[in-house]
A protein has these predicted regions:
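Helix-to-loop junction immediately C-terminal to a conserved catalytic motif
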Residues: 50
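ABC ATPase C-loop
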Residues: 150-151
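Conserved beta-strand-loop-alpha-helix hinge in the C-terminal portion
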Residues: 213-233
C-alpha cells in the first residue's frame, strides 16, 4: 500500500478548472517530485492533499484513509507536514517560538523537548539564532526554519513546495542536501521544485504535470528527451 495515493483528482477555483484528473503515489520513505510549468496545478494538488482546496472528484488517501473532507489540522495530525512556497515564518516571533509552534498538536514535555534538540542538530545555524526574531534571518535561514518547524510534528510525509525559490545557488544546494538527508532518515517527501534538474536528480521517481493533468510518470525522467527539452533545456551532457 502506498503511503499517499491520489487518484483522478479534479479541482477548481470557482469556474476555472485547475486539476483535470491527477493521479500519483508516494511510498513509505520515498522521495517523489512533480515538475511542470507555472500554473500546471502542482501547488493546487498539494493544497487538495492538505484540505485547503476541495477536490471535486477523485480520491486522496493517506495510509489507506481518505483525506477528503477532513480539516487541515486533522490531516497534519495524521503525519503530513506541508511547507508552502515562500517564507512562512512568523516574523515577530523568535526562532524558538516558531519551532515550538510546529508541535502545536502535541503536549510540551520531555519528549517534545528532545525532538526540538534533534531538529536543531540538523540545523546548527538555527541554534545560533535561537532567540532572534524570525524576520531578522536571511532567506536561506528562514527556509531552514520552516522545514525545521514542520519536522517538529514528526511527520511521515513532507510536502515541499518550491523550497529553493529565491535562494542563492549555494544556499539552494544546501537545501537540497537537507532534503536528501531527511529522506534518507525515513521521511517521505513529495517535492515541487522550480529547479527541475535538481528535483529529478534527487527524486526516486517523478511526475510531469501539464494543464492540471498527469502526463508522464516514472524513474529516470532526467533521461527522457521530452522532459529534457521541455524542462531541462536539452541534454544534460551539454551542462
Amino acid at each position: 500500500m502506498s503511503l499517499l495515493s491520489v487518484r483522478d483528482v479534479t479541482a477548481s477555483y470557482g469556474k476555472v478548472m485547475a486539476l483535470h484528473g491527477v493521479t500519483l503515489n508516494v511510498g513509505r520513505g520515498e522521495l517523489v517530485c512533480m515538475v511542470g510549468a507555472n500554473g500546471a496545478g502542482k501547488t493546487t494538488l498539494m493544497k487538495v492533499i492538505m484540505g485547503l482546496v476541495p477536490a471535486a472528484t477523485g480520491s486522496v488517501e493517506f495510509e489507506g484513509r481518505s483525506l477528503l473532507g477532513m480539516r487541515t489540522h486533522d490531516i497534519a495530525q495524521l503525519g503530513i507536514a506541508y511547507v508552502p512556497e515562500g517564507r512562512g515564518t512568523l516574523s515577530e516571533l523568535s526562532v524558538r517560538e516558531n519551532l515550538r509552534l510546529g508541535a502545536f498538536s502535541r503536549r510540551w514535555n520531555a519528549e517534545t523537548r528532545g525532538d526540538l534538540e534533534r531538529v536543531l542538530e540538523r540545523f546548527p545555524i538555527l541554534v545560533e539564532r535561537i532567540d532572534q526574531t524570525a524576520g531578522t534571518l536571511s532567506g536561506g535561514e528562514q527556509q531552514m526554519l520552516v522545514i525545521a518547524r514542520a519536522l517538529m510534528s514528526c511527520p511521515q510525509l513532507m510536502l515541499l513546495d518550491e523550497p529553493s525559490l529565491g535562494l542563492a545557488p549555494l544556499i539552494a544546494a544546501r537545501m537540497f542536501e537537507i532534503i536528501t538527508a531527511l529522506n534518507e532518515q525515513g521521511v517521505a517527501v513529495l517535492l515541487v521544485e522550480q529547479n527541475a534538474h535538481a528535483a529529478l536528480r534527487l527524486a526516486k521517481r517523478g511526475y510531469v504535470i501539464e494543464l492540471g493533468c498527469t502526463v508522464l510518470e516514472g524513474e529516470n525522467l532526467s533521461e527522457n528527451e521530452g522532459v529534457l527539452d521541455a524542462y531541462l533545456g536539452g541534454s544534460l551532457a551539454a551542462r
